[in-house]
Design a protein with these regions (language model features):
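A generic structural motif
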Residues: 53, 63, 70-72, 79, ...
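Short acidic-glycine-tyrosine-enriched beta hairpin
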Residues: 79-94
Length: 150
Protein backbone atom coordinates (compact mmCIF):
# COMPACT_ATOMS: atom_id res chain seq x y z
CA UNK A 1 0.00 0.00 0.00
CA UNK A 2 1.15 3.51 -0.77
CA UNK A 3 0.26 6.97 0.53
CA UNK A 4 1.83 9.96 -1.18
CA UNK A 5 3.40 12.88 0.65
CA UNK A 6 0.62 15.09 -0.79
CA UNK A 7 -2.07 12.77 0.60
CA UNK A 8 -0.39 12.73 4.02
CA UNK A 9 -0.15 16.53 4.02
CA UNK A 10 -3.90 16.74 3.26
CA UNK A 11 -4.90 14.29 6.01
CA UNK A 12 -6.79 16.18 8.72
CA UNK A 13 -5.27 14.36 11.66
CA UNK A 14 -7.06 13.64 14.92
CA UNK A 15 -6.63 15.79 18.00
CA UNK A 16 -5.93 13.52 20.96
CA UNK A 17 -5.98 14.52 24.63
CA UNK A 18 -4.78 11.89 27.10
CA UNK A 19 -7.47 10.82 29.56
CA UNK A 20 -5.10 11.22 32.53
CA UNK A 21 -3.48 14.53 31.54
CA UNK A 22 -5.15 17.48 29.81
CA UNK A 23 -1.70 18.89 28.90
CA UNK A 24 -0.94 15.76 26.85
CA UNK A 25 -2.29 16.97 23.50
CA UNK A 26 -1.16 15.93 20.05
CA UNK A 27 -2.44 15.79 16.50
CA UNK A 28 -2.21 12.25 15.12
CA UNK A 29 -2.18 11.03 11.53
CA UNK A 30 -2.34 7.23 11.64
CA UNK A 31 -0.24 6.27 8.63
CA UNK A 32 -0.32 2.59 9.60
CA UNK A 33 -4.12 2.54 9.55
CA UNK A 34 -4.09 4.35 6.21
CA UNK A 35 -2.21 1.45 4.61
CA UNK A 36 -3.95 -1.35 6.53
CA UNK A 37 -1.21 -2.32 9.01
CA UNK A 38 -2.65 -4.49 11.78
CA UNK A 39 0.36 -5.36 13.97
CA UNK A 40 2.43 -2.16 13.84
CA UNK A 41 1.19 1.33 14.61
CA UNK A 42 2.83 4.14 12.64
CA UNK A 43 1.73 7.65 13.58
CA UNK A 44 2.80 11.07 12.35
CA UNK A 45 2.25 13.23 15.42
CA UNK A 46 2.51 16.97 15.96
CA UNK A 47 2.93 18.40 19.45
CA UNK A 48 2.37 22.15 19.86
CA UNK A 49 4.77 24.26 21.94
CA UNK A 50 3.97 23.80 25.64
CA UNK A 51 2.24 20.43 25.14
CA UNK A 52 3.45 16.86 25.53
CA UNK A 53 2.72 13.67 23.62
CA UNK A 54 1.17 11.58 26.36
CA UNK A 55 1.14 10.99 30.10
CA UNK A 56 4.46 9.64 31.48
CA UNK A 57 4.07 5.87 30.92
CA UNK A 58 5.73 2.50 30.38
CA UNK A 59 4.52 -0.49 28.34
CA UNK A 60 5.04 -3.95 29.82
CA UNK A 61 4.73 -5.85 26.50
CA UNK A 62 4.92 -3.45 23.55
CA UNK A 63 8.05 -1.89 22.05
CA UNK A 64 7.77 1.75 20.97
CA UNK A 65 10.03 4.19 19.09
CA UNK A 66 10.13 7.84 18.05
CA UNK A 67 11.93 9.48 15.14
CA UNK A 68 12.02 13.29 15.29
CA UNK A 69 11.29 14.96 11.94
CA UNK A 70 11.21 18.64 12.95
CA UNK A 71 11.07 20.89 15.97
CA UNK A 72 12.78 20.53 19.31
CA UNK A 73 11.78 19.19 22.68
CA UNK A 74 12.76 17.05 25.63
CA UNK A 75 12.40 13.29 25.97
CA UNK A 76 12.03 12.24 29.58
CA UNK A 77 12.97 8.61 30.25
CA UNK A 78 12.84 7.61 33.89
CA UNK A 79 14.68 10.39 35.75
CA UNK A 80 16.71 11.50 32.70
CA UNK A 81 15.78 14.44 30.45
CA UNK A 82 17.35 14.45 26.98
CA UNK A 83 17.03 17.35 24.50
CA UNK A 84 15.79 16.07 21.12
CA UNK A 85 15.66 17.48 17.61
CA UNK A 86 15.45 16.58 13.91
CA UNK A 87 17.04 13.23 13.07
CA UNK A 88 17.06 11.91 16.64
CA UNK A 89 15.75 8.39 17.27
CA UNK A 90 14.56 7.09 20.64
CA UNK A 91 13.60 3.47 21.38
CA UNK A 92 11.55 2.18 24.30
CA UNK A 93 11.87 -1.59 24.73
CA UNK A 94 8.94 -3.35 26.38
CA UNK A 95 9.36 -3.48 30.14
CA UNK A 96 11.60 -0.41 30.12
CA UNK A 97 11.46 2.87 31.98
CA UNK A 98 8.50 5.25 31.72
CA UNK A 99 8.78 8.10 29.24
CA UNK A 100 7.10 11.14 27.70
CA UNK A 101 7.90 13.63 24.95
CA UNK A 102 7.59 17.33 25.84
CA UNK A 103 7.61 20.20 23.36
CA UNK A 104 9.44 22.87 25.32
CA UNK A 105 10.53 24.51 22.07
CA UNK A 106 9.02 27.41 20.12
CA UNK A 107 7.73 25.54 17.06
CA UNK A 108 5.65 22.39 16.51
CA UNK A 109 7.47 19.14 17.31
CA UNK A 110 6.77 16.60 14.56
CA UNK A 111 7.65 12.94 15.11
CA UNK A 112 7.07 9.54 13.61
CA UNK A 113 5.91 7.22 16.41
CA UNK A 114 6.10 3.48 15.78
CA UNK A 115 4.87 0.76 18.09
CA UNK A 116 3.58 -2.76 18.32
CA UNK A 117 -0.14 -3.48 18.34
CA UNK A 118 -0.44 -6.55 20.49
CA UNK A 119 -3.83 -7.92 21.51
CA UNK A 120 -2.84 -7.31 25.13
CA UNK A 121 -0.60 -4.92 26.99
CA UNK A 122 -0.19 -3.47 30.46
CA UNK A 123 0.69 0.23 30.72
CA UNK A 124 1.79 1.89 33.94
CA UNK A 125 1.33 5.62 34.61
CA UNK A 126 3.58 6.03 37.67
CA UNK A 127 2.98 9.75 38.25
CA UNK A 128 -0.77 9.12 38.36
CA UNK A 129 -0.57 5.84 40.27
CA UNK A 130 -2.59 4.10 37.54
CA UNK A 131 -2.28 0.90 35.52
CA UNK A 132 -4.09 0.17 32.25
CA UNK A 133 -4.88 -3.41 31.29
CA UNK A 134 -5.70 -3.78 27.60
CA UNK A 135 -6.94 -7.11 26.23
CA UNK A 136 -8.60 -7.66 22.85
CA UNK A 137 -10.22 -4.22 22.80
CA UNK A 138 -11.24 -4.12 26.47
CA UNK A 139 -9.51 -1.45 28.53
CA UNK A 140 -9.51 -1.39 32.33
CA UNK A 141 -7.76 1.34 34.31
CA UNK A 142 -7.09 0.70 37.99
CA UNK A 143 -5.34 2.42 40.86
CA UNK A 144 -1.97 0.69 41.33
CA UNK A 145 -2.51 0.72 45.11
CA UNK A 146 -5.45 -1.66 44.58
CA UNK A 147 -3.03 -4.34 43.37
CA UNK A 148 -1.12 -4.38 46.66
CA UNK A 149 -4.36 -4.55 48.65
CA UNK A 150 -5.60 -7.72 46.95
Amino acid sequence: MYVSADAIAKMAGTRRVHQLDSAAIRTDKSLGDEVGLKHIGVHLITIAPGDKSTEFHAHKYEDEAIYVLSGRGTEIVGETAQKIGPGDFIGFPAGGEPHETVNDGTEPLVCLVIGQRLAQDVVDYPRKGKRLYRNSGQRDMIDIREIAQR
